[in-house]
């Protein structure tokens, strides 16, 4: 829980050097001074603590005992993936609880400021909502596809839990045999959630921005007389070329890290399929479960080198190597 809070604080401190467009979804200030940083950090602390308390209360209302509710509240808000028991089915007993848990998982999928912006709607322009609006559409589309095409042999509530858990990079799920959907859930893990959330992943808005920029570049060559704006729906913010480069480098760093870690795991004797899955979950800080076909994977059998490699790449996946490079460029390579 503290790690998730610290991660959100770090976004505030790094936003000035990392992403100009995302800063506009947080504040109207052109640059963060110390008072603005403290203001946003205090707001994060209140929201983070308040949402945790609300999750705890809701879980209690739906007959989940207090100790389990507290553990789940800490895990859900921080995308931690920790359980007080070995099997989630020992806590979640019926379909109603499964659906409620699936919805509560979205607290770490959407921006931590989403609820705050809704409450104080009158003081906000569309820029404060555009990422979450995209995420709402993305979530509805994915859930609809699963409901129509992947819910014949499995209960939809179990699929909904796996979807929310994967999108939020939490990872745990009910024990189900869905080997045909393992890759789909892994893709959802890679995409991730909001920039201002405790979820990991490459972030949906970055992938969508790269996709739109690529399409515009292709169209600009086929229709040179037309002007194509790098602007997403629900916003007036334009993505400049420098930000697109940062998004591309983020994807490049992930691919490079994924290739190195998969190679290390394969060399250590783990079969390629498990190495592939474990590398994605490690870089995206997502716990292994039956949704990804790794519920029975035994980490005790790994040697020390592989264990430390997993720890190292968890850190790389969380803070992003690109962030470190940007800090070096900002403070050490000013000239």
Tell where the protein language model's regions lie, with residue ranges.
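Membrane-proximal intracellular helices of multi-pass ion channels
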Residues: 1-335
